[in-house]
């Protein structure tokens, strides 16, 4: 009710960066569908939308087990979608498992060709030094839980986390493209359960929103 009230008051849509549920269940999916259908909400999928329980291998095969239910949450592609709001192209890309797929970079390039400023909506924040340092301190395993972490760090992770969060070629390609594309003006992300703002590539603000925070962000 509070979120809906803010949306009515401001006239702005809600940008949700994932984990709208904690685990997959019939009841949780029903609640999420009602919320999204009743709210002006643009949604980037998170890892918990696919989570049947903790500790399982996270890959496209695992996603596929619950993807049919996740796809019912929104009337667009959960892997990649865009929406123009106030002259800004908001692009939601699924990186819920710490990687990007090859076609997502190609699709982002086509969005950029529209010529509008782009704000990326991701679940997992992109690697940035200060955020990585904070995450390493908070993690009992000294793990970043970020997308695009250099191999110099992930190679020292416990084996399960290294395989989970290693930066593959497709992910490196996407991040290289984001770093060099000046029409990409900001990144909105979630996943970490706390608020954090930093700068990527010396020019792109990355705004991480925690699990209990509702922000109003002004883009100029």
PLM segments and residue spans:
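His/acidic metal-ligating clusters that form di-metal
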Residues: 2-13, 98-197
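N-terminal active-site segment of His-dependent metallophosphoesterases
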Residues: 1-29
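Short active-site segment of divalent metal-dependent hydrolases/proteases
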Residues: 21-22, 89, 126, 194
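Extended active-site neighborhood of metal-dependent phosphoesterases/phosphodiesterases
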Residues: 26-119, 142-146, 180, 197-218
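Short, hydrophobic beta-strand segments that form beta-sheet elements in well-ordered domains
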Residues: 14, 21, 43, 184-190, ...
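Short, flexible loop segments at the rims of nucleotide/cofactor-binding pockets, characterized by
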Residues: 18-23, 70, 95-98, 162-167
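Active-site glycine-centered loops adjacent to acidic/histidine catalytic or metal-binding residues
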Residues: 18-19, 46-47, 123, 190-191
